[in-house]
Regions:
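Acidic/His- and Gly-rich active-site-bordering loop/insert found
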Residues: 2-131, 155-158
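Acidic/histidine-rich catalytic neighborhood of metal-dependent amide-processing enzymes
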Residues: 131, 135-158
């Protein structure tokens, strides 16, 4: 293993509890399609606490429809975008290098029927080293890693 990889993996291991805590908090916020507002408020507070520039907005449906690639999904037809804001946290660089854009989605598929779950879908419980809960892997886990990358980018000169 390369020295850089060893440093990063060692660092991640040292942050394990913090990473798990953040992901568990996010998993415990139900964010079924159409009901993402509370989870987006959580992300807003998270970005603000990281001293990022934060921007939120609800997409303009009429403007979206003008785009040639617009596709009206079933969830869009059912829920639209009211109370489903996009939340962006921006960290401006100080140099002339390239930018990076980390993104993810906070909505999850309904856990129904709840009776089919071995572990509660909003628990974020850990069993045998694995976290269980709606969104733990898709995509709240990815959001958690994005959060860590932004927090720690300068440590690894990324």
């Amino acid at each position: 293993m390369k020295i850089v990889e060893e440093k990063i993996l060692g660092y991640l291991d040292s942050k394990r509890d913090e990473i798990i805590d953040f992901l568990r908090k996010l998993v415990r916020i139900p964010s079924v399609v159409g009901e993402e507002l509370e989870a987006q408020k959580f992300m807003y507070r998270t970005f603000r606490d990281m001293d990022l520039e934060v921007d939120t907005w609800e997409p303009d449906v009429n403007e979206l429809r003008k785009h040639p690639a617009f596709f009206e999904t079933t969830s869009f037809r059912k829920y639209g975008y009211k109370n489903r804001p996009n939340v962006i946290g921006k960290l401006r660089g100080g140099g002339g290098g390239s930018s990076i854009f980390l993104c993810g989605h906070i909505d999850v598929v309904s856990p129904e029927p709840i009776s089919d779950w071995t572990y509660p879908p909003w628990s974020g419980g850990i069993v045998n080293g694995k976290m269980y809960g709606r969104g733990a892997a898709d995509q709240k886990g990815g959001i958690c890693i994005n959060d860590l990358c932004v927090k720690e980018h300068s440590r690894f000169r990324i």
